[in-house]
From Swiss-Prot:
This is BBSome complex member BBS7. PANTHER family: BARDET-BIEDL SYNDROME 7 PROTEIN. The gene is Bbs7. The modification N-acetylmethionine is found at M1. Keywords: Acetylation, Cell membrane, Cell projection, Cilium, Cilium biogenesis/degradation, Cytoplasm, Cytoskeleton, Membrane, Protein transport, Transport. It is found in: Cell projection, Cilium membrane; Cytoplasm; Cytoplasm, Cytoskeleton, Microtubule organizing center, Centrosome, Centriolar satellite; Cytoplasm, Cytoskeleton, Cilium basal body. It comes from the Eukaryota. Part of BBSome complex, that contains BBS1, BBS2, BBS4, BBS5, BBS7, BBS8/TTC8, BBS9 and BBIP10. Interacts with BBS2 (via C-terminus). Interacts with CCDC28B. Interacts with SMO; the interaction is indicative for the association of SMO with the BBsome complex to facilitate ciliary localization of SMO. One of its GO terms (cellular component) is axoneme. The BBSome complex is thought to function as a coat complex required for sorting of specific membrane proteins to the primary cilia. The BBSome complex is required for ciliogenesis but is dispensable for centriolar satellite function. This ciliogenic function is mediated in part by the Rab8 GDP/GTP exchange factor, which localizes to the basal body and contacts the BBSome. Rab8(GTP) enters the primary cilium and promotes extension of the ciliary membrane.
Length: 715
């Protein structure tokens, strides 16, 4: 990495949504550009930068929340008309701020994504896609899952209109008119789409995608099939991708890839050998990066990466050096511009301090008045609750515009809180009376000063379902709190996948009865994550899932009056049977339940658990030895007398302890899964084997795979 960029904060607007900031084009190369940004207060602000200060060009009045901002204009001309999506309306402004368009789309849902190409307007709400030409309806498509972004391949290069939808079910849908031409499976839920090199590359068919689990890829969209070019995995476990741009920030004549993530990470990838991108620069900001674009804003001749963050900061990472070299014997003098900026900042700070003092006094006086009424200050929370495939844990991210004081986590189901490296908050646990009020967890995170983003990790137990609640209290007066609820589902560790291995030994659960397609779909939504709330189009639905903890799989096929569920894990079938029959009983629906149990599947599941259990037992054994080995080392003065295996444990002691600490109750969790498997195997035979559980735990304590399998067979 040989790119050095300096940070400059230009302006703070209201809270911003994804892709709501753009740079207006200029006629001269590397001349300063104007920035236009829309916020959730409905305000559009256009400004330039002179002598390091933001100078407004225009500012609109507040209105509905702005969900997208795009630039448009006639094809092959500078794209300098500003279009915003707010609610179900599209408004257009000139670069001077004059409104020239107000188009009410009459969509029943608010617009979530927008793309403009010449006179073509592509919009998507949660599930609905619409294509307009000159504000006249052209095409329409109803998606089976939520649409996160929409784009169109460049018409000027391909002479055809090819829209692409990024859908939550890990699929890119390539459209032709109102029909799907073909679907492209991607490794995670796609959150953002962008044209490769800003124009689709040489062919015009290059499409970049970013996913919510932090992966990045390039696909060539041909007329007949997709061609996967490359994909960058998220090995460093960074945040999900919110924005992507192409710009030559390295100055080598080849456009680089600029990436903004929801954990505040900004990355620059360059194409050294023109094949796969190489990371050349990264910098961590303290909050989500909602928009990113390369250009020139601060000073003529100096390229920079311009960002908008969740709390509304418009920031530049510029190539302009902050320090100027001085010759030998010369003193480095601050230029007049820098001195002016410092004095301006000082006076601004003094003014703000005086204003804060004044407002505090006013508040103090009014709060003591008998007539005064206190109003609760409103604040928005940007939250995300997602399942991580790598470690089978849920990541809960809470982001507030102002500093967070504390977050109280309450759960009515047993969950484990895992360590997060980025989390500097101090956590304290309160004892829970689980019998009286179903409280299994009460934990308070007290945040350090100026923390606006908090990330937590939890691991749930399948079969135990309920609600996790987060009470978020920011540092504002009067003290106020917002509650966010997250559902822990019965099969919470299952994740959607595109295909499963049909050769595995499968157990089958079949439900029949007088229930509608919508009813059985609502039961599947209740049991499993990542299932769209609306029933899919057609008479039958098929979903595939993989258990992120054990790698077992589940197939759900259902229609009106029938549901068939297949899994290589008996415990999954047992959980589904219990939960679905309970849900049907609530609605007074008679269910006919039948099942086919494959005995081979039990041995198969135990073999899947084996490497994980063996690894955890070995890790626990090594951690237990560390203190004794350290004592021996101190006593003997060296480690030469130890075997290579013990020396290795001492060398890796910190790493082993850290890993063990990160996975609390991991071993107990595996023991629990084997115990459930044992009980469930015999439950389907009508036998209660709970009295044999202590014997099973004894076998697990002196674990041997063959002995365990024999015990399962003999019981």
């Amino acid at each position: 990495m040989d790119l050095t960029l300096s940070r400059a904060d230009y302006l703070q607007v209201g809270v911003t949504s994804q892709k709501t900031m753009k740079l207006l084009p200029t006629s001269r190369q590397r001349a300063t550009q104007k920035v236009v940004v829309g916020d959730q207060d409905g305000v559009v602000i256009c400004f330039g930068v002179k002598k390091g200060e933001a100078v407004p060009v225009f500012k609109t009045l507040p209105g509905q929340k702005i969900s997208r901002l795009e630039l448009g204009g006639a094809v092959n001309t500078p794209q300098e008309k500003i279009f915003i999506a707010a609610g179900s309306e599209i408004r257009g402004f000139t670069k001077r701020g004059k409104q020239f368009l107000s188009f009410e789309t009459n969509l029943t849902e608010s617009i979530k994504a927008m793309y403009i190409s010449g006179s073509d307007l592509f919009l998507s709400a949660s599930y609905i896609y619409n294509h307009y030409c000159d504000c006249k309806d052209q095409n329409y498509y109803l998606s089976g899952d939520k649409i996160n972004d929409v784009i169109c391949l460049p018409v000027e290069k391909l002479s055809r209109v090819t829209p692409v939808l990024a859908c939550q079910d890990r699929v890119l849908r390539v459209l032709q008119g109102s029909d799907v031409m073909y679907e492209i499976e991607v490794p995670g839920p796609p959150t953002v789409l962008a044209l490769h090199n800003g124009d689709g590359g040489d062919s015009g068919e290059g499409l970049l995608f970013g996913t919510s689990d932090g992966r990045l890829g390039l696909i060539q969209i041909t007329t007949s099939k997709p061609i996967h070019k490359w994909e960058i995995r998220n090995d460093k476990k960074r945040g999900g991708i919110l924005c992507v741009d192409s710009f030559d920030i390295m100055g080598d004549g080849v456009k680089d890839l600029l990436v903004g993530r929801d954990d505040g990470m900004v990355e620059v990838y360059s194409f050294e050998n023109a094949n796969e991108p190489v990371l050349r620069f990264d910098q961590m900001l303290s909050e989500s990066v909602t928009s990113i674009q390369g250009g020139c804003v601060g000073k003529d001749g100096y390229d920079e990466i311009v960002l908008a963050t969740y709390s509304g900061w418009v920031t530049g990472l510029t190539t302009e050096p902050t320090h100027k070299e001085s010759g030998p014997g010369e003193e480095l003098k601050l230029n007049q511009e820098m001195q002016n900026k410092i004095s301006s900042l000082r006076s601004e700070i003094e003014h703000l301090q005086f204003k804060v003092l004044q407002e505090r006094e006013n508040y103090q006086q009014s709060s003591q008045s008998s007539q005064a009424k206190s109003t609760v200050p409103s604040f928005s929370i940007n939250d995300k609750f997602t399942l991580n495939k790598e470690d089978a844990s849920y990541s809960l991210v809470l982001e507030v515009r102002t500093a967070i004081d504390n977050v109280l986590i309450q759960s009515d189901v047993p969950i484990d809180l895992l360590d997060v490296d980025k989390n500097s908050a101090v956590v304290s646990f309160s004892s829970c009376d689980t019998e009286s009020n179903d409280n299994f967890l009460l934990a308070t995170y007290r945040c350090q000063a100026n923390t606006t983003r908090l990330e937590l990790k939890i691991r749930s137990i399948e079969g135990q379902y309920g609600t996790l609640q987060a009470y978020v209290t920011p540092r504002i007066q009067p003290k106020t709190c917002q509650v966010r609820q997250y559902h822990i589902k019965p099969l919470s560790l299952h994740q959607r996948t595109h295909f499963i291995d049909h050769d595995r030994p499968m157990n089958t659960l079949t439900l029949t009865g007088q229930f509608s397609f919508a009813e059985v779909h609502s039961w599947v939504v209740f049991c499993l994550p990542e299932v769209p709330e609306k029933p899919p189009a057609g008479e039958c639905a098929t979903f595939y899932f993989q258990n992120t903890f054990l790698d077992t799989q589940l197939e759900c096929v259902y229609r009106k009056g029938e549901g068939v569920f297949k899994s290589d894990n008996i415990s999954t079938i047992s959980i589904l049977k219990d939960v679905l029959s309970k849900e049907a009983t609530k609605r007074k629906i008679n269910l006919n339940i039948s099942y086919e149990i494959n005995e081979v599947s039990v041995k198969h599941t135990l073999k899947l658990i084996h490497p994980k259990l063996e690894y955890q037992l070995l890790l626990a054994k090594k951690v237990q030895l560390i203190d004794a080995l350290k004592e021996l080392q101190v006593h003997e003065g060296n480690t030469d007398f130890l075997t290579p295996e013990y020396r290795c444990i001492l060398e890796e002691a910190d790493h082993l302890q850290e890993e063990y600490k990160k996975q609390p109750a991991h071993l107990e969790r595996l023991y629990g899964m084997i115990t459930d498997l044992f009980i469930d195997k015999f439950k389907f035979k009508g036998t209660n084997v709970k009295t044999k559980v202590p014997m099973l735990l004894e076998i697990l304590d002196s674990y041997d795979q063959n002995t365990l399998i024999s015990f399962f067979d003999a019981a």
